[in-house]
């Protein structure tokens, strides 16, 4: 008996039609943004660092590298005092905006069920920004003065017998002004995150017997932390770079690093101004980096 050998033919593989190589679309999409960052962020920072090592004389600046401006900065009580004042006021304003902004965001983002009303309330928070920044700052002067509205009201209701002089032209007035101006930057991100919380989760916790504070501690606060971090970054960057509010509301009694930079630039002392700018940039970068370690925004948002 003979066996017929059968052969199994392998399928013939046909080559895919060749297509002309296209340029990397991702690189093309990133190129404008990267170029913009290099020209308007990286290059100015590098130039500022470079100028901070130039030789500063009384009437001019020479491109001769030296550490004299850095030594002057860290050996001067004026500069170090301004650095400490900047950090102190930033911490106080950050806490005050959080204490004022979180309850407002909680009401707008969670308790107000009507989306139209919630949006309208957020718009009301933004309305002051339709006016000039300087007008919003100077508007506090008639409010905080010795014969201002706050002192008059407190005297009318009998809480005080003499005007409170510390309300204006002091560090307190700067803190009050900054808190009011920048509070909206804390309210917005927190309200956005609170608005994303599924109401059924809170209802389930209530059905299981959880009270408000336990729900807040275990559900609301953790889910709103990305908004808190984003708001804290917004407030921190703007407060650390402040100079106008302190100049207008403190009568130049409060010196921030921003005020030092403005003064040095006005005096044509570019090296000293650059040193203060580098220190301020490092401080801002450290603050933002520390806050980003609290919450991974790429996963949470």
Where are each of the predicted segments found?
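Transmembrane alpha-helical segments of polytopic membrane transport and secretion proteins
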Residues: 1-31, 113-118, 290-301
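C-terminal transmembrane helix and the adjacent membrane-cytosol boundary/short C-terminal tail
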Residues: 2-11, 108, 191-202, 206, ...
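Interhelical loop and adjacent transmembrane-helix boundary motif
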Residues: 11, 15-25, 57, 70-78, ...
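Transmembrane-helix boundary motif in ABC transporter permease subunits
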Residues: 18, 92-125, 199-201, 292-296
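Transmembrane alpha-helices
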Residues: 32-43, 127, 180, 185-199, ...
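Short membrane-interfacial helix/loop motifs at transmembrane-helix boundaries
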Residues: 42-77, 143-148, 247-252, 301
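Non-cytoplasmic
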Residues: 44-52, 56, 137, 142, ...
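Membrane-interfacial helix termini and adjacent extracytoplasmic/periplasmic loops
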Residues: 67, 137-179, 213, 249-252
């Amino acid at each position: 008996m003979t066996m017929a050998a059968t052969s199994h033919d392998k399928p013939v593989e046909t080559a895919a039609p060749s297509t002309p190589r296209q340029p990397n679309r991702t690189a093309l999409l990133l190129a404008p943004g990267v170029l913009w960052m290099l020209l308007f962020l990286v290059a100015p920072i590098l130039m500022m660092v470079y100028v901070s090592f130039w030789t500063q004389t009384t009437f001019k600046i020479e491109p001769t590298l030296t550490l004299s401006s850095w030594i002057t900065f860290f050996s001067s009580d004026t500069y170090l005092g301004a650095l400490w004042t900047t950090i102190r006021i930033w911490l106080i304003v950050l806490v005050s905006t959080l204490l004022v902004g979180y309850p407002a965001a909680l009401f707008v983002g969670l308790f107000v069920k009507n989306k139209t009303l919630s949006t309208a309330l957020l718009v009301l928070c933004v309305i002051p920004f339709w006016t000039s920044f300087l007008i919003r700052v100077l508007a506090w002067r008639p409010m905080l003065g010795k014969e201002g509205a706050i002192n008059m009201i407190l005297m009318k209701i009998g809480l005080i017998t003499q005007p409170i002089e510390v309300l204006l032209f002091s560090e307190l007035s700067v803190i009050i002004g900054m808190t009011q101006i920048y509070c909206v930057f804390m309210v917005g991100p927190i309200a956005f995150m609170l608005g994303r919380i599924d109401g059924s989760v809170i209802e389930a916790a209530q059905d299981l017997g959880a009270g408000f504070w336990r729900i807040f501690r275990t559900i609301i606060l953790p889910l709103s932390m990305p908004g808190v971090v984003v708001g804290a970054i917004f407030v921190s960057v703007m407060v650390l770079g402040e100079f106008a509010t302190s100049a207008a509301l403190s009568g130049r009694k409060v010196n921030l690093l921003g005020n030092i930079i403005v003064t040095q630039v006005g005096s044509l002392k570019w090296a000293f101004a650059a040193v203060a700018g580098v220190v301020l940039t490092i401080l801002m970068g450290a603050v933002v980096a520390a806050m980003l370690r609290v919450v991974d925004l790429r996963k949470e948002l």
